[in-house]
């Protein structure tokens, strides 16, 4: 079992139950999935860029990646319907907790000029989204073998009903929020 999953069950859930004054431990908010998305607009000119992005995201997550395609043609962006324009992957269960552990303990401290995560990046329903400017903060990526620096979006979907519950959950996981 993943280390953070065990910490959640034994320490975080009982603490949050008391803090949020919930009656049942099943009411305690939990993280259900983590979605990583890499939008690649420059893939229009070169199809190899998608392959490199797929390889990077697969190294980071250890899971097969889905290539996203344009739903409709947009002349202003020179995009045709069905063209690959991004990659995404959804992590659940043990892989999700292992990724979260690596993100919090290894990757975020490697971000240049890191001053903490924005505590206002919640969506109103307890889900948290953050952006990473460079994929090289992850130790799985070899700096010498990347073709370009690419950012990615990370979304943590929780069962929290409000932003305050979601914030309490992520603070319990020791997320480094800015004050």
UniProtKB/Swiss-Prot annotation:
Top-level taxon of the source organism: Bacteria
Lineage: Bacteria, Pseudomonadati, Pseudomonadota, Gammaproteobacteria, Pseudomonadales
Key words of the record: Ribonucleoprotein, Ribosomal protein, RNA-binding, rRNA-binding, tRNA-binding
HAMAP family linked to this entry: Ribosomal_uL5_B
Subunit structure: Part of the 50S ribosomal subunit; part of the 5S rRNA/L5/L18/L25 subcomplex. Contacts the 5S rRNA and the P site tRNA. Forms a bridge to the 30S subunit in the 70S ribosome.
InterPro entries xref list: Ribosomal_uL5, Ribosomal_uL5_bac-type, Ribosomal_uL5_C, Ribosomal_uL5_CS, Ribosomal_uL5_dom_sf, Ribosomal_uL5_N
Name the record gives this protein: Large ribosomal subunit protein uL5
Gene Ontology biological process terms, A to Z: translation
Keyword Zinc: no
Any single GO CC term annotated in Swiss-Prot or TrEMBL for this entry: ribosome
GO molecular function, one term: tRNA binding
Organism: Stutzerimonas stutzeri (strain A1501) (Pseudomonas stutzeri)
């Amino acid at each position: 079992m993943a280390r953070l999953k065990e910490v959640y069950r034994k320490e975080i859930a009982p603490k949050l139950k008391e803090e949020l004054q919930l009656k049942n431990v099943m009411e305690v908010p939990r993280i259900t999935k983590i979605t990583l998305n890499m939008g690649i607009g420059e893939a229009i000119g070169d199809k190899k860029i998608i392959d490199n992005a797929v390889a990077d995201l697969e190294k980071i997550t250890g899971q097969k990646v889905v290539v996203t395609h344009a739903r409709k043609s947009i002349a202003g962006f020179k995009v045709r319907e069905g063209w690959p324009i991004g990659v995404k992957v959804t992590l659940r269960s043990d892989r999700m907790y292992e990724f979260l552990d690596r993100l919090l303990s290894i990757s975020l401290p490697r971000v240049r000029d890191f001053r903490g995560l924005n505590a206002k990046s919640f969506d109103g329903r307890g889900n948290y989204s953050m952006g990473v400017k460079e994929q090289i903060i992850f130790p799985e990526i070899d700096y010498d073998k990347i073709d370009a620096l690419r950012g990615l979006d990370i979304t943590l979907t929780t069962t929290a009903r409000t932003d305050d519950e979601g914030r309490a959950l992520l603070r319990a996981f020791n997320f480094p929020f800015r004050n």
